[in-house]
């Protein structure tokens, strides 16, 4: 028997599908940033923790997803697709994978929207978190740098699989049945990466002049937010990305298991960037603001890996023009463009050299192995010790020859001459005379007093002790041979024992009376 979907259930279902689509885009894009994500669990979820997952939304990605959806939801014949592609510094591009969220006409009228659909969408989103990290594009995203970057594009409509080449494979993340149709989340990914293996990349300037990590906090929280050169300022444009609280509706539904409806604090520690109206014809990078350098009007402060800043040119260099409708998501791991905060004159020189991009490999290795103490203070490399380094990198620590010479484990001190009575038998004249050195240089006598030893003359090791006491000798009380005494001998001695008892019967009676 088919049941009609109530207006409240329909409203909840549309809200579930809407935010599932937005969270799907966030999960896919964040999995291609090239960085590991570590999120701590919270016992008090906020109203934006949809599907019981604490996924920090990137405002720019949410803005692009909402712009692609344009108020419509994935339905029969309307699919939402997220295309992941690769672009090199020479301008060559290659599509890597396409994620598709679609719906078919198979309905489940008996399923409950308020509980079952919501929980199954949560499980599907968790499956997506795992699947996005097993496809080949994830490994490429972890290695992106100045040679290539990973781009993404969101579109709504028919799935375009022509760019994946021949022999691409598909994987279905999962399906969730609803009263209006069955949601299906799948992925088609490229397996022929010959383009990457045959081309020899050269050291070139970065593709984008502004390369920012999505997960680095602002080094100067008190400074005013900066704006990329492709965007207008907030006063000129008058349009800004909405914050997390504004971009997401509170997760309130008709059932009691929804998260609380109050947002206590902001989920993100950085200020959102501003979208410029005058650059609509240009492809713009998805970046996060970190602070404005007032001294250099054409340079931007970019947060580095160590919490420092790097001065990067605001205008794109060679190969900076990205494809329209594609957004770059990249943070370089190369040490030539990531330096510590200029706290001294030497650090300032390092920042200027790294911004030019002409650092030698030796300088790169030296920068990597410089130990940082405190926030951004550099410790001289000759002060690096094995104990101050992490365990996996202790083997790469520079060895100090003077310390090795004084180490008693490397060069043990000379042992004193022993007076053991066995000394003469162990060291013969022939063995010591042939070497030309003293006898104690060839042999080191150690007073060996093991445990479980009977005496000092006959030492006993643990194995001998264990074997000896594992099979102990029989007790003397158990060694009497009772079989030698026969029953006849017992009967012959019985009259004698009775006669002795009758003779001393009075003594026995007196003893018994004393006991009473």
From Swiss-Prot:
Residues 336-359, 405-438 are annotated as: Disordered. Its main location: cytoplasm. The keyword Methyltransferase does not apply. GO terms for cellular component: Atg1/ULK1 kinase complex; cytosol; mitochondrion; phagophore assembly site; phagophore assembly site membrane. Residues 341-357 have a biased composition (Polar residues). It holds the Pfam family ATG13. Phosphorylated by ULK1, ULK2 and mTOR. Phosphorylation status depends on nutrient-rich conditions; dephosphorylated during starvation or following treatment with rapamycin. ULK1-mediated phosphorylation of ATG13 at Ser-354 is required for efficient clearance of depolarized mitochondria. Residues 127-134 are annotated as: Important for interaction with ATG101. The keyword Acetylation applies. GO terms for molecular function: protein kinase binding; protein serine/threonine kinase activator activity. A motif (LIR) lies at residues 443-446. Keywords: Acetylation, Autophagy, Cytoplasm, Phosphoprotein. The modification N-acetylmethionine is found at residue 1. The modification Phosphoserine is found at residues 354-355, 360. InterPro entries: ATG13, Atg13_N, HORMA_dom_sf. It is found in: Cytoplasm, Cytosol; Preautophagosomal structure. GO terms for biological process: autophagosome assembly; mitophagy; negative regulation of cell population proliferation; positive regulation of autophagy; response to mitochondrial depolarisation. Part of a complex consisting of ATG13, ULK1 and RB1CC1. Interacts with ATG101. Interacts with ULK1 (via C-terminus); this interaction is increased in the absence of TMEM39A. Interacts with ULK2 (via C-terminus). Interacts (via the LIR motif) with GABARAP, GABARAPL and GABARAPL2. Interacts (via the LIR motif) with MAP1LC3A, MAP1LC3B and MAP1LC3C. Interacts with TAB2 and TAB3. Interacts with C9orf72. Interacts with RB1CC1; this interaction is increased in the absence of TMEM39A. Belongs to the ATG13 family. Metazoan subfamily. Autophagy factor required for autophagosome formation and mitophagy. Target of the TOR kinase signaling pathway that regulates autophagy through the control of the phosphorylation status of ATG13 and ULK1, and the regulation of the ATG13-ULK1-RB1CC1 complex. Through its regulation of ULK1 activity, plays a role in the regulation of the kinase activity of mTORC1 and cell proliferation. The LIR motif (LC3-interacting region) is required for the interaction with the ATG8 family proteins GABARAP, GABARAPL, GABARAPL2, and MAP1LC3A. This is Autophagy-related protein 13.
């Amino acid at each position: 028997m088919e049941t009609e979907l109530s207006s409240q259930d329909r409203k909840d279902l549309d809200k579930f599908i809407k935010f599932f689509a937005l969270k799907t885009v966030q999960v896919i894009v964040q999995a291609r940033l090239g960085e590991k994500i570590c999120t701590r669990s919270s016992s008090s979820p906020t109203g934006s923790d949809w599907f019981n997952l604490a996924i920090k939304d990137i405002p720019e990605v949410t803005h692009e997803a909402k712009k692609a959806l344009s108020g419509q939801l994935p339905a029969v014949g309307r699919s939402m697709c997220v295309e992941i592609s690769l672009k090199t510094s020479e301008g060559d591009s290659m599509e890597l994978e396409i994620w598709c969220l679609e719906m078919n006409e198979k309905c489940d009228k008996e399923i409950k929207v308020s509980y079952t659909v919501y929980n199954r969408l949560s499980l599907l989103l968790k499956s997506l978190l795992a699947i996005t990290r097993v496809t080949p594009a994830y490994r490429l995203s972890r290695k992106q740098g100045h040679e290539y970057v990973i781009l993404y594009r969101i579109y709504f409509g028919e799935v375009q699989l022509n760019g994946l080449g021949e022999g691409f494979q598909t994987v279905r993340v999962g399906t969730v049945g609803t009263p209006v149709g069955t949601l299906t989340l799948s992925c088609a990914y490229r397996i022929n990466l010959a383009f990457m293996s045959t081309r020899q990349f050269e050291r070139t300037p970065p593709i984008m002049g502004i390369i920012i990590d999505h997960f680095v906090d602002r080094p100067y929280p008190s400074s005013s937010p900066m704006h990329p050169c492709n965007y207008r300022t907030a006063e000129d444009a008058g349009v800004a990305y909405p914050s997390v609280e504004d971009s997401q509706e509170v997760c309130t539904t008709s059932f009691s298991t929804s998260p609380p409806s109050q947002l206590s604090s902001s989920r993100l520690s950085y200020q959102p960037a501003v979208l410029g109206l005058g650059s609509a014809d240009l492809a713009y990078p998805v970046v996060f603001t970190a602070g404005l350098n007032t001294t250099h009007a054409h340079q931007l402060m970019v947060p580095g890996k160590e919490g420092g800043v790097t001065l990067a040119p605001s205008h794109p260099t060679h190969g900076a023009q990205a494809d329209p409708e594609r957004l770059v998501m990249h943070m370089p791991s190369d040490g030539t463009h990531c330096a510590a905060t200029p706290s001294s004159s030497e650090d300032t020189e390092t920042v200027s050299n790294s911004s030019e991009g002409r650092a030698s490999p030796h300088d790169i290795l030296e920068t990597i192995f410089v130990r940082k103490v405190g926030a951004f203070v550099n410790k001289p490399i000759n002060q690096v010790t094995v104990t101050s380094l992490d365990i996996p990198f202790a083997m790469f620590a520079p060895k100090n020859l003077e310390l090795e010479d004084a180490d008693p484990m490397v060069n043990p001190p000379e042992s004193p001459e022993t007076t053991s009575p066995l000394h003469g038998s162990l060291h013969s004249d022939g063995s010591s005379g042939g070497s030309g050195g003293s006898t104690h240089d060839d042999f080191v006598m150690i007073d060996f007093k093991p445990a479980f030893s009977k005496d000092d003359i006959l030492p006993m090791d643990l194995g001998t002790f264990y074997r000896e006491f594992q099979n102990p000798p029989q007790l003397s009380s158990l060694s009497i041979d009772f079989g030698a005494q026969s029953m006849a001998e017992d009967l012959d001695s019985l009259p004698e024992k009775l006669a002795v008892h009758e003779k001393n019967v009075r003594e026995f009676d007196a003893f018994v009376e004393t006991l009473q």
